[in-house]
């Protein structure tokens, strides 16, 4: 039986930490940043954090190959 593949979209969006938690990136920081104020962009620089346990279970299932 072949190896299971990771869900490539999930592999690009989530990272597993050493403790096993799953980190994600925050939204609204990708493009069209010129119309956002400096204050808004500064507040968006804060780390987005980890997934909730119910979502982390789903993400782990998608990341099994990576």
Curated annotation (Swiss-Prot):
- Segments of this protein annotated with the region Disordered: 1-48
The molecular function terms in GO held by this entry are: structural constituent of ribosome
Q: Give start-end ranges for the coiled-coil region(s).
A: none
Q: Where is the composition biased (Basic residues)?
A: 1-44
User: In Gene Ontology terms, what is a biological process of this protein?
Assistant: translation
Question: Sorted alphabetically, which keywords does the UniProt record give?
Answer: Ribonucleoprotein, Ribosomal protein
- Superkingdom is Bacteria
- InterPro entries xrefs: Ribosomal_bL35, Ribosomal_bL35-like, Ribosomal_bL35_CS, Ribosomal_bL35_sf
**A Pfam family assignment:** Ribosomal_L35p
Q: Cellular component terms, GO, for this chain's entry?
A: cytosolic large ribosomal subunit
Q: Which residues form the signal peptide?
A: none
The similarity annotation says: Belongs to the bacterial ribosomal protein bL35 family.
User: NCBIfam families per the record?
Assistant: rpmI_bact
Q: Record's PANTHER family?
A: 54S RIBOSOMAL PROTEIN BL35M, LARGE RIBOSOMAL SUBUNIT PROTEIN BL35M
* UniProt protein name: Large ribosomal subunit protein bL35
Q: Name the species this protein comes from.
A: Legionella pneumophila (strain Corby)
């Amino acid at each position: 039986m072949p190896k299971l593949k990771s869900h490539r979209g999930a592999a690009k969006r989530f990272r597993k930490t050493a403790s096993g938690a799953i980190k994600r990136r925050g939204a609204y920081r990708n493009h069209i940043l010129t119309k956002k104020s400096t204050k808004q962009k500064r507040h968006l620089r804060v780390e987005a954090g980890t997934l909730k346990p119910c979502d982390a279970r789903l993400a782990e299932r998608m990341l099994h190959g990576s």
